[in-house]
């Protein structure tokens, strides 16, 4: 969902499926925040982002999936006793490893926007106007 989208010409793009949310806070300082997986984090971070987004600052909010780690389950020992005579067969069974997705991380990026300052041109012929 979107949070505070469209203040001051701000643009909010929410990417579903990819898990990425972009919020451009240009033109009044308030932009939309695209929430992909963590709405509580987005709600808590919305006022701070809106205030911090000065007209000279572009704040992008991305929701990046957390680090996926490989979880190796412990091996299972199977014992089998065959009678008679007492024969003990012990097998070590290793289950396949599972890929566990970690919690999503919300990354706030502040990129200074490019501000073109007007360079005053040297005023030629200024003294000639005074004569």
Swiss-Prot record:
Keyword Repeat among UniProt keywords: yes
A GO molecular function held by the record: structural constituent of cuticle
Keyword tags: Cuticle, Repeat
Function: Component of the cuticle of migratory locust which contains more than 100 different structural proteins.
Source superkingdom: Eukaryota
The keyword Ion transport is annotated on this UniProt entry: no
Biological source species: Locusta migratoria (Migratory locust)
Sequence repeats: 37-40, 45-48, 53-56
Domain notes: The tetrapeptide (A-A-P-[AV]) repeats found throughout the protein are also present in many proteins constituting the protective envelope of other species.
Protein name, entry field: Cuticle protein 79, isoform A
């Amino acid at each position: 969902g979107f949070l505070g989208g469209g203040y001051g010409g701000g643009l909010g793009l929410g990417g579903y499926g990819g898990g990425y949310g972009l919020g451009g806070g240009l033109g009044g300082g308030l932009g939309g925040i695209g929430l992909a997986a963590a709405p509580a984090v987005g709600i808590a971070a919305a006022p701070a982002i809106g205030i911090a987004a000065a007209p000279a600052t572009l704040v992008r909010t991305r929701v990046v999936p957390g680090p996926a780690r490989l979880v190796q389950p412990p091996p299972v020992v199977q014992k089998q006793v065959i009678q008679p005579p007492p024969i003990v067969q012990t097998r070590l069974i290793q289950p396949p490893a599972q890929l566990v997705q970690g919690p999503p991380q919300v990354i706030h990026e502040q990129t200074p926007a490019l501000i073109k300052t007007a360079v005053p041109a040297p005023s030629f012929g200024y003294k000639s106007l005074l004569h």
